[in-house]
Structure formats: structure tokens, C-alpha cells
Amino acid sequence: MEQYDQIGARLDRLPLARFHYRIFGIISFSLLLTGFLSYSGNVVLAKLVSNGWSNNFLNAAFTSALMFGYFIGSLTGGFIGDYFGRRRAFRINLLIVGIAATGAAFVPDMYWLIFFRFLMGTGMGALIMVGYASFTEFIPATVRGKWSARLSFVGNWSPMLSAAIGVVVIAFFSWRIMFLLGGIGILLAWFLSGKYFIESPRWLAGKGQIAGAECQLREVEQQIEREKSIRLPPLTSYQSNSKVKVIKGTFWLLFKGEMLRRTLVAITVLIAMNISLYTITVWIPTIFVNSGIDVDKSILMTAVIMIGAPVGIFIAALIIDHFPRRLFGSTLLIIIAVLGYIYSIQTTEWAILIYGLVMIFFLYMYVCFASAVYIPELWPTHLRLRGSGFVNAVGRIVAVFTPYGVAALLTHYGSITVFMVLGVMLLLCALVLSIFGIETRKVSLEEISEVN
């Protein structure tokens, strides 16, 4: 495996232009539709139960099929992306999701729907990881955090989008239309990616395909020079004299030396994200009801509290490049841990609402930091997708078992204990991140790739 630092330096000196906006548009559109299809399942299941298509057992199988697909996709997508290219991995998984979602619109029974849901999950698990990880290789280091966060901001509108469209489509048409809309949209993204999603020059150079990387990058440079009416600045003497380095890209490097440290930090970061995300967002309505708030009011209060999610991601995009990554992530975890406990001891509805809103605001700032920004930055180019894929797969496993732990604590000890245990775990994760995390803010991917 070869790595060519000059290619990275030339990508980092580019001013933002239509080239970057097209890449951003294709990936963000794909992530939005992926989220739409994922959250549409929640809306569709209620309809399937009411019309006799499904029951609690089949609903569980439907949900588990998606989660298992996510797990498989996260692992396989990383290998495809590192061995065969970012563009090919992205487009293959777009096609899988598009065909599976379209097929789900025409299934004859629930068993076929569960099968297509698994295929959707496999493609979406890979697509999310490949999208975020690939994006980091195109965006200049000085604004990489901000634009990766914006990618997350667009993608996280999908719950509201699926809920809004689902209310109309399922009521007046059919649940099948939800999958058909998502499938057609994904296939449109697949078509557009064929025209505008180029192969990562960093990946080409890393594979020793220097001529291909040079051709792709020179074309981009010429487009930007014409668009901006400028001449790109020359590279520094260090950048222009960068040498080719040979690195073997075996998957097992993730568990050796410096890479093991990064792998463990990444797993810790995602464990913190998943246990907080699934504890807080999934169980908020239940905790409301257990606190004596009626169901209708709990649903309304949950909707109000979740407004903090897009606002948190929006603010994260504005400020994330102004603070060191380790400080930013660990501080957010400490804030969430403290707010979680304060939130759990509130008894008045207005206090629950205010503290819940603020907690969700900071939680989604952390979700943005972890999934969209920090994790994709941690890895050398030749391991980026496999590293991201593996730690995301571990995160999926944690997400599967977290609800059972929360349910046991909630049943035997109450909601305050749930948030106390969560707080202790988040504080431990913050400690690991602050001590062992590596700093990636405004650092070129080539510098981050250095393995000591």
C-alpha cells in the first residue's frame, strides 16, 4: 500500500468550490434518504399491525433484521471501500438500498418485507459509514470538522421528514409508498453519484495509482481555477518534496501498537454515543409515563424536547473547528452526564421540559462530533473505512443490548438510577477520550495517518 502525501496537500489547499458542494450534496442527500427509510419503518409498523399483516413477533423480527443488516453492512462496507475504492463502495450500497427499498414496496407478505428490510439495513449500514468517511478525504483540513458536521445536520432531519410524509402518505395512500419514495430517491442518488462522485485521489494514491490520482486531481484543480478565476498557490517545499511511503494495509493493524490505541478510543467514543443516545431518546416517553404524566402529554413533551437535536447539530457545525477535538468531545460527555442526573430528579413538567431540551441539545452535539467528525478522521487512508466500519459494528452491538440494561435498571431501581449509571459511564468515557484520544482538528489526514 502506497501513500502519496503531495496529493493530500493539494486537496487541502483547494478553496471550497462547486466540486466540494456536489460531493456534499450527493452524500447528504443519500444520508437523508437513508435516515428516511430507517425511520419510516417505525411509522409503517403501526399500520401493518392494524391491518393484520404483522404482530409483535414479526415486528421484532422486522426491527432486528434492520439492526443485523446495519452490523453486517458496517463491517463489509469497510472492506469494500478500502480494497475497491470509495466511489465503488458508495455506489454499490446505494444500489443495494435502492433495489431493496423498491422491492419492499411490492412484497406479498411480511416475511418478504423482513428479508428486504435486512438488505436495506446492510446497504444503509455501509452507506452511512462510507459516506462520512469518504467525505473527510475531499474536504480541506481547515474546514473539515464544520462541513462534516453540516453533513450530519442534513442527515438528522430524516426523523421529522419521515414522520411528516408518513402522516399523509399512510393515511391517504399506502404504506408501500413510503418505501417506494425512499427507493426511487436512493436510485436517483445512485445515478447522480455516477456523474459527480469521483474516486478519492487520496485512495488512488494510497493504492499506488499515482497517475489516476494525478488525473482526477488535476481536473478538479483546473475546474476550480476556472470557476474562481485564480491560480492555486504553490505547495510548500516540504509538501512538494513529500516522498512515497509504503504501508501494508492489513485489517489486523487496527489491533497493533498505535492503531490499537485509536481503535479503543474510537470504540469508547461510540459506546458513549450509543448508550446515551438509546438511553435518553428511546426511554424518555416511558420515563414520563412512569413519572405520572399521561401518554398524550408525554408524546407532546418528547416532540418538544427533540427540537434540541437539529439545533444542537447546527451549533456544533458552527463551533466544532474552534476547539480541540478531545476537549470538545470530553466536555460534552461531562455536560450530558451532569444534565442527565439533574433531569432525572425533576418533578415539575416545565423543569422536565427545559432540562430535557438542553440535554438533547448537548447530546446531539456529541452525536455529530462522534459519528460525523471524529471517528472518520482517526484512521490512515488505507484503513479508514475498515477502521470506521469495525468500530461502528461494535457500536451497533452495544445499541442492541443497551435497552435491556436500561429496562432492568428502570424496573428495579427507577429512572434516577438509570441516569446515575449512565453518568458514571459517560464520565469514564470522557476520561479515556481526554487522556488517550489523538488531536485531529485542522490536521491533514496525512499527518493523522502517521503511525508511531
UniProtKB/Swiss-Prot annotation:
Cell location: Cell inner membrane
Ranges per topology, Cytoplasmic: 1-20, 81-91, 141-152, 199-265, 321-326, 377-388, 439-452
Topological type in the membrane: Multi-pass membrane protein
Main localisation: membrane
Alphabetical UniProt keywords: Cell inner membrane, Cell membrane, Membrane, Transmembrane, Transmembrane helix, Transport
Molecular function terms, GO-annotated: transmembrane transporter activity
Xref: Gene3D superfamilies: MFS general substrate transporter like domains (1.20.1250.20)
Spans through the membrane: 21-43, 58-80, 92-114, 118-140, 153-175, 179-198, 266-288, 298-320, 327-344, 354-376, 389-411, 416-438
InterPro entries: MFS, MFS_dom, MFS_trans_sf
GO cellular component, one term: plasma membrane
One Pfam family cited in the UniProt record for this chain: MFS_1
Topology Periplasmic: residue spans: 44-57, 115-117, 176-178, 289-297, 345-353, 412-415
Family named by the database record: Belongs to the major facilitator superfamily. Sugar transporter (TC 2.A.1.1) family.
Protein name in the entry: Inner membrane metabolite transport protein YdjE
Species this protein is from: Escherichia coli (strain K12)
